[in-house]
């Protein structure tokens, strides 16, 4: 596995490398560089594989160093687990920002190699672990790592259960329809065939795990046909866009995991 170095990370998500806090924050806020946490993860065998930061909107260029960012970490010791669940690797997913809007949050993640899907496990399966910007101890990061590591076998077991549950076409549509309601509400028509669309031969399966991954990828990558009706009855067709918001990406992932877990 080729891990990301700091130069590569800086090109994609410069906020990860920020060493100072935003000027508008009070003295109560204690700046903790994301790289300090990454160093501790590295000492424990977890290295960065993928990064992303929020898009620039209000505040312009001056806000870029403090944007919310997400870093996914993988440990080579878990590679054997990937063989048990179809080339899907357990991960630690770390989110943070340096603008005072977010603490460090550790999530359990899964990375599916065949489609480069990055999943995030719902809170009822693994409650996210937080470290606030008011004080920092190395032991807190190690506790978070241990919490994730302890829960990996349980998460793998859930995936194996999903892989073993075969879904009828009716069940697949019901799953997709509920996902649509949870994602967009009940006021928008959405093409369910697009939501369930198969993007590659490896995703033609009818087990819950494969269906879950198809829906997740289609919702996050965009391209699903939808329509809305205005106040005078005019219908407007649209295609969904790729999800670029870190918070929305995690929300959709956790929503779909919860929906899938309920169907086991």
Predicted features and spans:
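Intrinsically disordered, low-complexity regulatory segments
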Residues: 1-35, 39, 43, 53, ...
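Sequence-level detector for tyrosine residue identity
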Residues: 3, 29, 47, 66, ...
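A broad "ordered helical/assembly scaffold" signature
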Residues: 24-26, 49, 144-145
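Amphipathic, interaction-prone secondary-structure segments
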Residues: 31-104
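Intrinsically disordered, low-complexity regions enriched in serine/threonine
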Residues: 76-264
